């Protein structure tokens, strides 16, 4: 029933977008609507069709099921667009990236310590197919169409999530919890949180933090600034209503990064101007916010103590796995199976006080480690983890260079969104595994991958150009007019 309601909602959104365009409908607008509907579909955690289930609930962050996700259907549409409009004239794929992906896939599948290769196949299949999808996506649309389509889809997402979050927990209408996900679950009565279209408050908080940074990027680049400001506020309230502390902190850190790296990009990071104009005022505002209206999230000392103990126990599990296989890990999507077969709650009792924890063994061996970086280093080992860590550092270090080299702010929206996503990974990834779920990766990976598209960075859009580009174009036009005037008759 939940999937039926999802398709009905998507159909209603499609009709709304088409009717809104009316007589203005063109082929480009139709493509933007297709992007919008796809983006909107990503917010539903049950928007997948399981093909094969391994029959074990202890799968890693990708679970035990091989499934069809929305981007598979979208890929068929992209192939049709490329065949009909592009006549199969598309850019050659990056060969080096292709070999890197294949190397990672072969490396983790051939891992002699990976005793759960079918679980690894699930994640590898998802990642490789998503890479193909992004290649088709980038070859089908311009960066302008991409931003316009994503914007429409995320506006629909934030409106729906906001309304559902108001229904629960604000109005305590518990019937909406399982409306779009029959397996959805909220937290205990001590700290309830909104679920909306996702299966858990933490997953919703993670997803909301990504469209929060997207609308913040639109706001700082002056793209539909008023509507973007409203969506930023709604996204922030959704994060608050999830009661996800990690998502809240990740969103705040991402916002600080946008201010420091983009708004004050002409200043050095620790220069007097950036500290005085950006970091100090924003820090004061955040401190007032966390000690005032949002202090209830951090006031439950008992809940914080229990959460901290659970995280430390999970980190200890990760350390045990790393100590066993530090170089090449135990295989993608396989750490939880390895832990369930090789771990025991007895090893916790000598280190942690578990008297206040409810069924600690069941929690530890049925939930992925609540730290995506520990998951990656356990599953890939140092050989596979260090290149990923190097990529994250490189991505942040080259942000300003990518911003300076771009010729339009449509691309800058993607670039800023990618920066915000990476910051969320760094913050929230240290206390949760939600950023590694495929439901969330559908959006976060799209921002990061598209922000690295050099063809998007090179596109020019005079109707939405930067102030500097506008001045250069006007000076060039004036110089051209003067040259014409001095030409003898």
Give, region by region, the residue ranges found by the protein language model.
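Hydrophobic, aromatic-rich transmembrane alpha-helices
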Residues: 11-25, 72-86, 210-220, 383-406
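Alpha-helical transmembrane segments of multi-pass inner-membrane proteins
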Residues: 104-108, 148-179, 189, 196-264, ...
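A membrane-periplasm/extracellular boundary helix in multi-pass inner-membrane enzymes
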Residues: 163-172, 242, 259-306, 319-323, ...
